[in-house]
Amino acid sequence: MNGIKQLHAHCLRTGVDETKDLLQRLLLIPNLVYARKLFDHHQNSCTFLYNKLIQAYYVHHQPHESIVLYNLLSFDGLRPSHHTFNFIFAASASFSSARPLRLLHSQFFRSGFESDSFCCTTLITAYAKLGALCCARRVFDEMSKRDVPVWNAMITGYQRRGDMKAAMELFDSMPRKNVTSWTTVISGFSQNGNYSEALKMFLCMEKDKSVKPNHITVVSVLPACANLGELEIGRRLEGYARENGFFDNIYVCNATIEMYSKCGMIDVAKRLFEELGNQRNLCSWNSMIGSLATHGKHDEALTLFAQMLREGEKPDAVTFVGLLLACVHGGMVVKGQELFKSMEEVHKISPKLEHYGCMIDLLGRVGKLQEAYDLIKTMPMKPDAVVWGTLLGACSFHGNVEIAEIASEALFKLEPTNPGNCVIMSNIYAANEKWDGVLRMRKLMKKETMTKAAGYSYFVEVGVDVHKFTVEDKSHPRSYEIYQVLEEIFRRMKLEKSRFDSLLQPEQLCI
């Protein structure tokens, strides 16, 4: 910085104009305050200098200053270039409304740059980020020539809004696809929870010899493998990532750890976590702590948290979800309460709904139902169905009718068409021989339109076929064979005298 100031002083003394060089050096540091003062005192501003500063303000999250400079450019009698519009469109995407962008769009249209593919791509992206997909699509449709980035920008817009049907219609219409095109739709399906389609698209991508998956593709596919239990494909992706040097990318490493954890390979996940060494980030720690908690290794999760603090990594809200989950699975009430209390007092983290949910679960499992209910009453946010459902489940286990009635009443308001709450409450009444309550639940179910959503599981078969099995469904082409196998399994279970917990009630009281 001292060198720049000395050069600036030399220019002022000698009258040599080195503003362009000085400005670019200042923006590299960056020192926007000094750069703006230099710019404002410069007598012969040009579009190039305006563009550099407009871009700098956008990059450093000051989009309003970019707009101010864009307006000054016109007052100075200068014409914006295609670079100007590209930078100002990108800056406008940070606003809460699409109105400024529409005004800029109209000026862009009159400027003669409307056929510039690069600017149109940025304009489509900006409209999409602001949720103005109709405007983005209009720009796309009015273009006479569309290159691959333009197609990708429009597909990404639909993907971000969760409209995968529109995204796939465009994707299928593309004359030529690149790795970004494939990765965008794969990521879209994965982020929207449609893991089977994400995996199917990846397997189709592998057949396209003109494209090669990149590290973003790998990061997008691994969650699908994790949630579908596709360990073999996950292993193949790990090998591919290592061969292509993608394991230098922390996001690839974290996604791989998550995949192995969810596929039950916790020891492999731990080994990969140790391999990361100093490369580990907060996401790595959170993923490993959460995985250990999920697999019942609560002591290891807490030990890892202590190591995390020793190494100077600051926890966040996600960290404490994993820690409290470990306490829930380990039945460690006191430790859970200590951690919950430390969130605000030590780490300055405000507990969220999921943290309260963990605490309700923790207290409920050990029978501290009144304490759990008291905690719900102190929550700064409105308890959701998960919180009340957790309390109701605990009441069912411990046979507490009084608090169960409070929880069920809240659930009936939040989920009036969910029959599960009525069934649980009916079972609680029956276990305590309160048959009038059972009849009341039965009448409520008949009065209200309650339908239970069918449960299902995904199983990935050979090739790209993913089969969805629904409870009592017979639409599968091999359903006869499937049910034959199930009957044989049930027969063998009975022979082994497997015991099922079921509550038998008088026929007139059954739901």
Curated annotation (Swiss-Prot):
Residues 387-462 are annotated as: Type E motif. It comes from the Eukaryota. InterPro entries: E_motif, Eplus_motif, Pentatricopeptide_rpt, PPR_At4g14850-like_plant, TPR-like_helical_dom_sf. GO terms for biological process: RNA modification. Keywords: Repeat. Residues 463-494 are annotated as: Type E(+) motif. PROSITE patterns: PPR. The keyword Repeat applies. It holds the Pfam family Eplus_motif. One of its GO terms (molecular function) is RNA binding. The keyword Glycosyltransferase does not apply. Belongs to the PPR family. PCMP-E subfamily. This is Pentatricopeptide repeat-containing protein At5g08510. It comes from Arabidopsis thaliana (Mouse-ear cress).
